[in-house]
Amino acid sequence: MTSLVSLENVSVSFGQRRVLSDVSLELSPGKILTLLGPNGAGKSTLVRVVLGLVAPDEGVIKHNGQLRIGYVPQKLYLDTTLPLTVNRFLRLRPGTQKTDILPALKRVQAGHLIDAPMQKLSGGETQRVLLARALLNRPQLLVLDEPTQGVDVNGQVALYDLIDQLRRELDCAVLMVSHDLHLVMAKTDEVLCLNHHICCSGAPEVVSMHPEFISMFGPRGAEQLGIYRHHHNHRHDLQGRIVLRRGNGHS
């Protein structure tokens, strides 16, 4: 399968500080890659590299032609005194046609919000509106920066279900950044754990049949949520230096 974006041994420094070191990844059509890591691990910098906003100091980044990207930011800051409906907010995007707005909202099950004030939306509703905005670009790559932040578990399940539906309909690649180091979208194809470098990678554990998991999240939640078990052979000290572990290194 031809990748839409590939990074090969990419490193980025800001001044004397190395933020990313020797990072490689591939984003392919129809595949979901989830990026995990603690605060300050370089996740946002890596996203900016993928988006073409930061050039690597070392390594190679390859894009597949004129790549169409849809981006959902981590947070949306709006002036609470500014009267702005969902309709008007989406029309602020350059090139957006009025006739495109309602179909995009309906695609994310948010058509009923078209005349709602942006400031009155819940966390989950805001994420759906931002996702609709990203879809206006007919993306080949969908980048979601911590889309479940501020969303409860039921909202996460619904959002993951929607993301899975969209990636199948659009056959787009999905890069999802998560603040949760263990609970991820079950249908993620690959998980990367980043702490300035790739600490480990793998697929989420299938837990949908575990009775304890089902009792906690319900059958639908168990289908959409997965556990990622890290397998580091090292840890990072307070200065960020790598310290090798003894034994099997599972965490």
UniProtKB/Swiss-Prot annotation:
First-listed, main subcellular location of the protein, grouped into a coarse class: membrane
Record keywords: ATP-binding, Cell inner membrane, Cell membrane, Ion transport, Membrane, Nucleotide-binding, Translocase, Transport, Zinc, Zinc transport
Name of the molecule in the record: Zinc import ATP-binding protein ZnuC
Domain of life: Bacteria
Reactions catalysed: Zn(2+)(out) + ATP(in) + H2O(in) = Zn(2+)(in) + ADP(in) + phosphate(in) + H(+)(in)
Cellular compartments annotated: Cell inner membrane
Family affiliation: Belongs to the ABC transporter superfamily. Zinc importer (TC 3.A.1.15.5) family.
ABC transporter domain residues: 5-220
Pfam family, one: ABC_tran
GO cellular component: ATP-binding cassette (ABC) transporter complex
Group of enzyme by EC: translocase
GO terms (BP aspect): response to zinc ion
Gene: znuC
Keyword check for Transmembrane: no
Function in brief: Part of the ABC transporter complex ZnuABC involved in zinc import. Responsible for energy coupling to the transport system. Seems to be important for the virulence.
Record's subunit section: The complex is composed of two ATP-binding proteins (ZnuC), two transmembrane proteins (ZnuB) and a solute-binding protein (ZnuA).
Binding residues for ATP: 37-44
Membrane topology: Peripheral membrane protein
EC assignment: 7.2.2.20
Induction: Transcriptionally repressed by zur (zinc uptake regulator), in response to high extracellular zinc concentrations.
Gene3D superfamilies, sorted: P-loop containing nucleotide triphosphate hydrolases
GO molecular function terms noted in the UniProt entry: ABC-type zinc transporter activity; ATP binding; ATP hydrolysis activity; ATPase-coupled transmembrane transporter activity
Record carries keyword Translocase: yes
